[in-house]
Amino acid sequence: MERTLAIIKPDAFAAGHAGGILARIYEEGFRVIGMKKLALSEKQAAGFYYVHEGKPFFDDLKGFMSSGPCVVMVLEADGAIRKWRDLMGATNPADAAAGTLRKEFGTSLGRNAVHGSDAPETAAFEVGYFFAGLDLL
């Protein structure tokens, strides 16, 4: 079984889509082994997205991710990283396939509803950023 980090971002949370996104996660056969609702500070958002530091969108990303509550989760499934990325859809909701979370719940490139780890190394860092080993079922 593989693990990946998933985030329901502040835009989707504020719009009341957390329940619909969680329902899809369970429907697709993921096991949620850790979940927290939290509000990130700009410093926490910067630490999480440190790989984007220096890029033109970094300040907007920090501001957005600290703009309201979000839900962070650890998902477990066979091939969890690819499976979650497929369910999320393309980064830009305008380019996302029908039936994906970003197509259904995202509104723009910067407000695309969900986040997911892109590789095993990234998943290990991201899961560890929000969860200690004892936090996971």
Swiss-Prot record:
It catalyses: a 2'-deoxyribonucleoside 5'-diphosphate + ATP = a 2'-deoxyribonucleoside 5'-triphosphate + ADP; a ribonucleoside 5'-diphosphate + ATP = a ribonucleoside 5'-triphosphate + ADP. Its EC number is 2.7.4.6. One of its GO terms (biological process) is CTP biosynthetic process. GO terms for molecular function: ATP binding; metal ion binding; nucleoside diphosphate kinase activity. Its main location: cytoplasm. GO terms for cellular component: cytoplasm. It holds the Pfam family NDK. Keywords: ATP-binding, Cytoplasm, Kinase, Magnesium, Metal-binding, Nucleotide metabolism, Nucleotide-binding, Phosphoprotein, Transferase. ATP binds at K9, F57, R85, T91, R102, N112. PROSITE patterns: NDPK (PS00469), NDPK_LIKE (PS51374). It is an enzyme of class 2 (transferase). The active site is at H115. Its cofactor is Mg(2+). It is found in: Cytoplasm. Major role in the synthesis of nucleoside triphosphates other than ATP. The ATP gamma phosphate is transferred to the NDP beta phosphate via a ping-pong mechanism, using a phosphorylated active-site intermediate. PANTHER family: NUCLEOSIDE DIPHOSPHATE KINASE, NUCLEOSIDE DIPHOSPHATE KINASE DDB_G0292928-RELATED. Homotetramer. Belongs to the NDK family. This is Nucleoside diphosphate kinase. The lineage of its organism: Bacteria, Pseudomonadati, Thermodesulfobacteriota, Desulfuromonadia, Desulfuromonadales.
